């Protein structure tokens, strides 16, 4: 990447408090099935620290909500979720929000199941075997992308925009441990930092 002329642009953001605005938001729309997003407002980071948090959050949520996990199987068996259930990390220099989302007849019950699963994992730790399998799978998928010119170009651009080197993700991913993931989960996935957004059908 060739650096361009510095135009002296400055982005100024107001200071963001750690407290959430509200614990839940409910909206209505002409939809067939109620949809929800449960997000956790976590401490923001930048550069390598942001990369580490993103990887840890991705792996921790993947283990917590894996299709073979007690959380996923329990909610599926009780009809609380379907195949749309997924996780996502929404983050940048000044925000970091892990999200769990999908369709449900009872989003409040889903929230309580997730809270209970997080509390259990914080106490006893995540499944180490599943964590290692998920980490190695992510590592392999990342390495495979290096065979694609477009993927490498996107990696270079995204890395430059994030203030990290193109191969920092590979290095960071290979060094993460189950202890790192458990620590992140205990410190960041706090019920008081969670907010539930619900979109339900208009009556």
Where are these regions (language model features)?
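Active/ligand-binding-proximal structured segments within catalytic/core domains
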Residues: 38, 49-65, 75
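A generic structural signal for well-ordered coil/turn residues at beta-strand boundaries
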Residues: 20-22, 31-34, 58, 94-96, ...
């Amino acid at each position: 990447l060739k650096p361009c002329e510095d135009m002296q642009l400055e982005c100024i953001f107001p200071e963001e408090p750690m407290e959430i605005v509200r614990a839940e938001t409910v909206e209505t729309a002409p939809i067939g099935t109620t949809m929800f997003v449960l997000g956790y407002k976590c401490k923001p980071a930048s550069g390598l620290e942001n990369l580490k948090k993103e990887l840890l959050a991705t792996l921790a949520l993947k283990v917590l909500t894996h299709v073979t996990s007690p959380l996923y199987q329990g909610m599926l068996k009780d009809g609380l979720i379907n195949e749309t259930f997924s996780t996502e990390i929404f983050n940048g220099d000044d925000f970091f929000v892990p999200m769990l989302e999908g369709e449900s007849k009872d989003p409040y019950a889903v929230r309580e199941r997730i809270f209970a699963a997080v509390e259990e994992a914080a106490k006893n730790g995540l499944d180490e075997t599943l964590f290692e399998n998920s980490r190695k799978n992510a590592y392999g998928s990342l390495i495979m992308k290096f065979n694609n010119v477009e993927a490498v170009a996107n990696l270079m651009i995204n890395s430059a925009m994030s203030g990290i080197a193109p191969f920092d993700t590979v290095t960071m991913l290979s060094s993460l441990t189950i202890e790192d993931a458990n620590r992140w989960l205990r410190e960041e996935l706090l019920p008081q930092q969670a907010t539930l957004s619900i979109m339900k059908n208009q009556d």
